[in-house]
Amino acid sequence: MASTRNGISKDELLPTYELQSQRDVENSGSVTSFASKISNNAAAAVLAYCLSSISMTLVNKYVVSGASWNLSFLYLAIQSFIGTVAIMVCKKAGLIQNLGLFDLKKAQTWLPISLLLVGMIYTGNKALQFLSVPVYTIFKNLTIIVIAYGEVFMVGGSVKPLALLSFGLMVLSSVVAAWADIQIATAATAKASSDSAVATLSALNAGYAWMGTNVVFSASYALGMRRVIKKTNFDNWDVMFYNNLLSVPILLLSSLLVEDWSSENLQRNFPAESRQSLVIGIFYSGVAAIFISYCTAWCVRATSSTTYAMVGALNKLPLAVAGIVFFAAPVTFGSVSAIVLGFISGLVYTWAKSTGA
């Protein structure tokens, strides 16, 4: 507290601009201190990562769940464009310090990885269009198995017993999830017309076909990126920038070639009653992709790579539950058992990676 003399405080004798300057410094210091505390807070990092990844999946599911949705290439092109613009804005604002200038040679080297990314995100969106969020989440675990054996084939080594156990649980959870899904679909179509039953089962089969293709693309992308990233010496922001930038023309050209841009089809995909929420969802998904990348790095920095892997395993449970809550996915003994098995398999795999057993 300022000292007083003759009832007049020392602050009252200072010019107004000096008082304001002192207050600005104090406020700036408190904001910096708060930001530093948040940046190093493990709980905040974990929560931000979980919320960003869960919300991204739910928003994608919402956008592609329209009865007449058939513009996935266009959706992903807009998503990648928004991501590219967001990165450039962050760089211009000084929020990203280590993003270099565009390099044509590096872009040419990275182009095959971007093609794999396009395959991964497109097949992922198509699978999410036909499958429920819990089933999609469970089957995503199969990518881990393909990556593990891909690394054994490319680099050498072997799969340890505990990792093998986790893989067995992942396969079992996927089989149980598929069985429960087919049982639910069969029961739902038993009372429907034959045409409706055939359409429902065809959509389910399409979802599993897209999911299988997505597992292959996802594993190929992860394995390929690890090799090419050593040649380009990219950091996280470089990967995000080139992935988004190079994906835009590929996705846009694909949309122009195979998708219907007529006004009638646009009206069907973006009906008036949900147009605003769909546009907001598409915009959010573009920005959220950048936010997930930041939260991933933040989580690893504030905790450890082992904790991050554990969070990834634990995150599958609330994601599956969120899919049930927001999209009314059927709750049966089979579906719940599959979710629990998938959750346990993730924990066992994380333990195997952290202990090397």
Curated annotation (Swiss-Prot):
The keyword Transport applies. One of its GO terms (cellular component) is cytoplasmic vesicle membrane. Keywords: Cytoplasmic vesicle, Endoplasmic reticulum, Golgi apparatus, Membrane, Sugar transport, Transmembrane, Transmembrane helix, Transport. The chain crosses the membrane at residues 44-64, 69-89, 108-128, 130-150, 162-182, 197-217, 239-259, 278-298, 307-327, 333-352. One of its GO terms (biological process) is GDP-mannose transmembrane transport. Residues 65-68, 129, 183-196, 260-277, 328-332 are lumenal. Its main location: Golgi. Homooligomer. Involved in the import of GDP-mannose from the cytoplasm into the Golgi lumen. This is GDP-mannose transporter 2. It comes from Emericella nidulans (strain FGSC A4 / ATCC 38163 / CBS 112.46 / NRRL 194 / M139).
